[in-house]
Regions:
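Hydrophobic alpha-helical transmembrane segments of membrane proteins
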Residues: 1-58, 67-225
Length: 225
């Protein structure tokens, strides 16, 4: 979704007007598309990562497997998918001869990495405190619950705060080094937050085991209960 919709939605705003070739969106087109892809995929990859497992989630609690390993595996899979999508968008932008450079690609990957790290920190907890079974045939609009959409409206701007500070630093110091410096600090803080949220998520999984299985077993699922 982010690959197709991101390119189609942001392209008119970035390059649609004559003489508007140099503005915030066009200069950072790949970054905008990458962050938009995160937004579109956030419910499946972050906020409710056990949704498609549904009743099969009980296998995670029955198998001799640590919940931290399960969460880490899902997080790594989400990161790989996001980075694969950004790579695809970068290739398409290059083929279409859109304004693109090695620095802009590095910037887009760096920003996406920081935002993803912060979203994963929140999403691991959300997936265990607000688990919902998801039907793969349903769209994002019908699959995401009201509580999840409200959380997205609050959490996503918070995750974008280091990015906003990085852009402000680049504007203030007129230097790309300032942007990457702020992003590095944001990544370091994000790593600390992620480590804390992982331990909290593991504890939540242990304390809420029955409620998680019950919530995800509602309706049809891969395992009959």
């Amino acid at each position: 979704m982010g690959f197709s919709f991101g390119l189609l939605i942001w392209a008119p705003m970035a390059f649609g007007r004559a003489g508007a070739r140099s503005n915030l969106i066009s200069d950072n087109y790949l970054t905008f598309v990458s962050v938009y892809a995160l937004l579109l995929l956030s419910d499946v990859l972050f906020w409710n990562c056990f949704g498609f497992d549904r009743s099969a989630v009980q296998a995670y609690f029955l198998a001799p497997l640590k919940m931290s390993t399960v969460l880490l595996g899902k997080n790594v899979a989400a990161i790989c998918l996001i980075f694969l999508e950004i790579t695809g968008v970068s290739v398409v932008c290059a083929l279409l001869r859109l304004p693109l450079s090695g620095l802009k690609i590095l910037e887009a990957f760096s920003i996406t990495c920081v935002v993803t790290l912060l979203i994963l920190s929140i999403g691991n907890l959300s997936s265990l405190y607000n688990p919902r079974p998801v039907n793969p045939s349903k769209s994002f609009r019908t699959a995401a619950g009201g509580r999840t959409q409200a959380m997205l409206m609050v959490a996503f701007p918070l995750a974008l705060l280091p990015v906003a500070l990085a852009f402000l630093a680049r504007y203030a110091f007129d230097s790309e080094w300032a942007l990457f410096g702020v992003l590095f600090v944001g990544a370091a803080l994000g790593a600390v937050v992620y480590a804390y949220s992982m331990s909290a998520a593991v504890q939540a999984a242990e304390d809420r085991k029955e409620r998680i299985i019950t919530a995800l077993s509602q309706g049809e699922g891969p395992i009959e209960t």
